[in-house]
């Protein structure tokens, strides 16, 4: 089994332009064989726009990681070329994201804004949440009780268990104090862990 798990960080829900795209390619023989984190040069370079981003408080983290070489700031077209090259080279059995509808939309929106026509995810990204964790983890009695016990409930008039990646990871790893970083590569790592656990619970393959 070989999978590609990706995550995007965007300016916001109302402006889902990608400034950070990270992904991991994993197989069940060698583990993680590719890990990449790219900052979109055309977006990140717009200082005023970045200051209004939903996770603008993460900017110092990005500055440090760029300085350390942990991530690279490159043009959007280059990011997608590398992603396509990795897909062609490693031939993953599936491309996944947690709440993939958001990532699909954000990548398409960024392509449209920046005039990039070749989108490696245009055929769709498989959803870890709706496809696997929702039926097999977050609707189980054990998960519901876990969320109730620790206060991981939504703020709806009738609260229900949170289904976001952070809470699912807390449950699976029994780490109630875990806080999602909300940077693309690091979030891809926890999404991979969730995917692998969900696949093991269902006996399914990617």
Describe every region a protein language model picked out.
Residues 2-110:
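Conserved non-catalytic scaffold segment of RNase H-like nuclease domains
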Residues 13-15, 133, 193:
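Conserved protein kinase catalytic core
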Residues 38-42, 120-137:
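A short, structured active-site edge motif that brings together acidic residues
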Residues 44-62, 130-186:
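Active-site-proximal helix-loop-helix substrate-binding element of RNase H-like nuclease domains
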Residues 65-70, 114-120, 175-180:
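Short, polar/flexible loop-turn hinges at active-site or ligand-entry regions and domain interfaces
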Residues 91-101, 105-106, 110-111, 151-206:
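Acidic, Mg2+-coordinating catalytic module of metal-dependent nucleases/exonucleases
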Residues 102-126:
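Substrate-recognition/cap helix-loop segment adjacent to the acidic, metal-dependent catalytic center
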């Amino acid at each position: 089994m070989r999978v590609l798990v990706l995550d995007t960080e965007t300016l916001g829900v109302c402006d889902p332009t990608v400034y950070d795209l990270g992904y991991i390619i994993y197989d069940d023989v060698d583990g993680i064989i590719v890990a990449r984190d790219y900052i979109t040069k055309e977006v990140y370079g717009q200082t005023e726009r970045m200051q209004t981003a939903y996770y603008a408080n993460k900017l110092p983290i990005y500055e440090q990681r760029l300085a350390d070489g942990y991530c690279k700031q490159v043009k959007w077209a280059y990011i997608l070329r590398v992603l396509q090259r990795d897909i062609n080279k490693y031939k993953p059995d599936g491309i996944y994201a947690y709440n993939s509808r958001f990532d699909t939309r954000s990548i398409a929106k960024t392509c449209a804004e920046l005039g990039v026509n070749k989108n490696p995810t245009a055929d769709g990204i498989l959803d870890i949440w709706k496809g696997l964790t929702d039926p097999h983890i977050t609707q189980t009695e054990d998960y519901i009780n876990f969320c109730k016990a620790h206060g991981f409930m939504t703020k709806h008039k009738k609260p229900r268990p949170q289904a976001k990646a952070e809470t699912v990871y807390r449950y699976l790893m029994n780490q109630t104090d875990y806080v999602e970083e909300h940077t693309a590569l690091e979030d891809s790592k926890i999404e991979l862990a969730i995917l692998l656990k969900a696949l093991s619970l269902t006996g399914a393959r990617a």
